[in-house]
């Protein structure tokens, strides 16, 4: 993801909503950019923490360990986190962090040392009321716990709210493991209430955490999952797939393609199936100008980040396909991270039903706010989502007298 795409996006939104140059310039520039060079086992690694906007509260965003992490990417992701927290209507801003490293090349001890070094480099600019990191690509609850432990050592007191995505035993929140999928399911349920459907068939591209849990949750609610896929390919059964069996096959063999009660298909084929709901939950840019005209779903639920290109969006809208955009559809994850932060700060612990009830309330409210705007104008659902999120951030900036 390039930061130039953010600039282009803001120019487009600015023209639609008549935001002035000062307002747009404020959003184009992250408030703070922090960089460091870390060294583990004689090798040096670039580390970043970007705080895009704190007008609505402390910034929130994950830390990723990946060989392609760059400052440009982290800046772009921090911006999207500002939009996502505003969309979910939680009182937090957007941030992001990362280390340019291939964690598969490091031992567990080296990963722990690198994680603690990251906190030592940035502990003065993070904190429960300043910047709250979380897991992201190739970072885990265990890594978050190491980071939290290091932060507490450095400041000399307990501060579990400094980081979310921790293990349950260390102050993590129940439901966090399914939060992204569950939040998306709540949004989809609201959309289905407003669209006349003769059947409820679903295809899920991606069978990692979000895709697998979405398939399970939707099947439990009576929707028919007819196709799923992972990086090795997909499986189709128009009579409906047994999701529990698929989970077992994936766990035991490494791929859903080894499931025997169905027809093997490609990831590209899955996207073009004649289903009611399409759930891209794996990669960016899978729905493009090349295949958008072949999409037959009535609803696209974006559990992945950025699965639809802007050119494809126009085609889908012209076909009256409702796209539930990523910053809404997968905001369940950051919302339950917010709940974890609240529980830590209050020295409290919510049971699973409490978390689910609060998550549903947040996701339904966010959807309803956007749907109201969507029903009043000629812009697609994604554009309305972005407009509302940017307006919330700028309204907060105005109240602070910064714009």
What are the language-model segments listed below?
Residues 233-323:
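Rossmann-like adenosine-cofactor binding region
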Residues 5-8, 69-72, 106-117, 138-142, ...:
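Conserved active-site and cofactor/substrate-binding residues in soluble primary-metabolism enzymes
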Residues 164-167, 172-274:
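Glycine-rich phosphate/diphosphate-binding loop of Rossmann-like nucleotide-binding domains
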Residues 85-198:
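Glycine/serine-rich phosphate-binding loop and adjoining beta1-alpha1 elements at the start
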Residues 2-37:
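Short, Gly/Pro- and small/polar-rich lid/capping loops
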Residues 191, 293, 297-403:
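Adenosine-phosphate binding glycine-rich loop
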Residues 30-103:
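Glycine-rich, N-terminal phosphate-binding loop and its surrounding beta-alpha-beta segment
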